[in-house]
């Protein structure tokens, strides 16, 4: 049987991996449980320069630039009174440093572009395909679907998000078969914060366009953070505050409109920018593209077992506060694709299919590489959300007097962020590509 990857999940990470496999000449199928991979999600995804570079490598840059929101400045402010504490041109500085801009993208637009550019979009994507079981065997995997179908392949890549069914099945297999105590089932993801992703009309609000506002510490005793970015017509926003009942590993409920209204009312007096409160924004909200949900956090120990491997939010999930969730997932996908391409290239020379042991070796290298890179980012996001929602004199003193003078984003035009994070971005090693550059050279380049 020709080597075939079964990708579970048709979100940005799953679709990106399909693009990578097409360029690696690896057969694949995407299983998506919804009736379409396209949706109307109003969630805004921050696409960092190193991730824009990944998209440029597969030919998507021009289309993405056409639909991206403009962004040039960042302003932090106190949620209680709207006083601006810091202003920076961080976004423009990063483009100077790396040659690529930050691209704020609606998730729906990104998915549409990934889908439309995929050669196998008609033949290699199965919708309404909910996975119920995965059975690895000596030479491949059997994936059972809720409709009774059986899909056969060589490996399964679980790109099915924070509530990954693939992970649940893998953990069950680990519990049944793993002899190594270190390979016990993963701990569950935990939600400590919840909030609203939404969109509102900016026609009457007059929020300054192309400025990313981050309002900190307002919203009652527990504190909250509100982030927003506007054009002259719309404003995209996200809010986060601690769950009233404390941390939970239960799946996020489907919040009702009444629950969203009550949540919004608790933030009504929080300044989202000078002169505009969250209550003003909520009065102009577009409910069709607005939703409330718990935001899980977790960093798992085990990313693979047998012929099953996990990627993206299925293994490392942060809140949205630092805007790095999708970036981490896509770069994990690039590393996994590189490992599979290298292994299969060697096996093709020998005219042999890779064994389970050889596949686990590739998965292990992928896990080791990405754990080293992602864990510091995850730790930073974990600390950041807890800091920005705080109320009290320590947080006030930090935001008012310390942050303006020792902000990593403004120090030397963001040089620390460029060197420690952005320049380290992954690349598909097997796809010829030169790309753009800036003042800070990329650590990884394609050598073909």
UniProtKB/Swiss-Prot annotation:
Pfam families hit by this protein: FAD_binding_3 (PF01494)
Chain positions recorded as FAD binding sites: 32, 107, 313
Entries under SUPFAM superfamilies matching the protein: FAD/NAD(P)-binding domain
Induction record: Expression is up-regulated during sexual development. Expression is also up-regulated during confrontation with the arthropod fungivore Drosophila melanogaster.
Active site per database record: 227
GO MF annotations in UniProt: FAD binding; monooxygenase activity
Record-linked InterPro entries: FAD-bd, FAD/NAD-bd_sf, FAD_mOase_fung
Stated family: Belongs to the paxM FAD-dependent monooxygenase family.
Entry protein name: FAD-dependent monooxygenase srdH
